[in-house]
Structure formats: C-alpha cells, structure tokens
Amino acid sequence: MENLIDFSDPILRLVLPILLKDQTTGKNIIWATDPPPKVDCGPMGEITMEQLDRIRLMPRVQKRLSEQKKRTKGKAEVFTPLWVVKKMADHAEQELNKGDWEQFVHERCLEIACGEAPFLTSRYDPTTGEPVAIPDRVGILDRKLRAIQENANHKFQWKALVLSAYQSVYGYEYQGDNLLLARVNLFLTFTENWIEKLGLPISTSWAIAVATRISWNIWQMDGLKDTVPGTDTLCLIFDWEENKEVTFRQIKEESDNV
C-alpha cells in the first residue's frame, strides 16, 4: 500500500505549523488520545513538528489491524466505506446544489466527528487505502472543486472560488491525530487540484491562505460540550462571511432559533 500522506513533502511542511494550530487556544492541537510511545507525553500533550519527525503518523487504514480494533473498542472509532460516503454525499449535494454551481460552492456544510474527513474529501478509500483519482472523489469539498474546475473561466476566478470553497466546509473531531490527518487531507486536496488545473508549482501565499482556513474550519472539540477537549473553553470558529470569530455554541443556538 502506497504512502497516503508524506509529512516530508516541502509544501506540507511549510504549512504544518498552521495545520497544527488550535485557533481557540493559540497553542497546538492536543493528542486527546493515547499518543504513540515514542512521543513521551500524555493525552493532553500538544502535537508538535518534532514528534511528527520521530513517528510515522498514518491514516487508520494503514495501521495494524490490532491497533484499528483497539481504537474501535476504546474510542468507538469506525470508518465508513467509500460507497456509503458517496450515497450520503449524493443526498447532501441534492440539498445544497439547487442548480447554480457558484452558489453551491458557497453553501456551508459541517461534518461532525469528522475523523479523517472522508465526507469532505475522499483522497483514498477509508477501508481499503486505495487512492482515489480526482475525478472520482465523492466528498462535498471534492464536488465543489469539481464544479469550479468545470466552470471557472480563468485561473484568477479558479483561485478565488477555491478559497471560497474551503471557507464553506467545516468539521470537528475530538482526537488530535485524526484531526491532523483531516486537515492534511484537505490541504493535499488543494495541492493536488492546483497541480491538475494549473500545472504550476504551488504558490506559497495561496498554500498559507488555504491552510489558515483549514485550521479555523476543521477544529478540535468535545462535541458533547462544545469545548476544547479536557477544558471548559468554548471552541471558536471563523465566520468568513461576517469576517469575525464566533463560538461554535453561538452558531448552534442561532441555528436552533431559525
């Protein structure tokens, strides 16, 4: 099975400090699970670049079967087959896409307890580990990017709409290693689409802009309390339309009152 995520990739390493950041605390995201033995810290310890240089952080499908079973038993961690992801994402797209492709790109959506974020981007099959070609990906972000690929008239429009697509997708996850994998998957989806569409080296400024949006929109949270795991601190997210920080709980309460 090929390496699905290469943490030595220069453009990924450039933005890793951003992808590791918890925008609520201003620190790095925490493990919030039992870290690998080589890490030498507890569940409340931050995930750092130095740790990632010592271990091989990999998607669930590439872990030993015994480790997968341990996570399923201890953390209720299960991953959805790609065909199920597709059927559910088909339904979500029907709700979001009313025929105006550009409006579809801007429609906001949230993947709860997102794990490695397969409902946003399906870079690989969660159960087999097989890479999925860009035209065959089924996540909601994948579909937004495909709409942009098919309809954007020039590269400037393409870039602006891709940024809007990333501003429109949200997800939260408790366990820090899964959260980082989700963030990295979204970032690599950007770089892969950039190369496919533009055929140019990745722009540093655009890579940073996309990574910043990912670090705000895909965040670490205890979904039962709306807080940073192990604390009473309410999680912040960013409302890109209003250009301001808000608590996730505030968004929930406003939605309940609609």
Set out the residue ranges of the language-model regions.
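A short N-terminal interaction module
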Residues: 1-79, 83, 91, 99-104
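Long, low-complexity, polar/charged, intrinsically disordered or flexibly structured peripheral segments
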Residues: 49, 235-258
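Proteins with a high burden of low-complexity, intrinsically disordered sequence enriched in S/T/G/P/A and R
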Residues: 77, 93, 99-100, 166-168, ...
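Short conserved micro-motifs at the rims of enzyme active sites and ligand-binding pockets
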Residues: 229-231
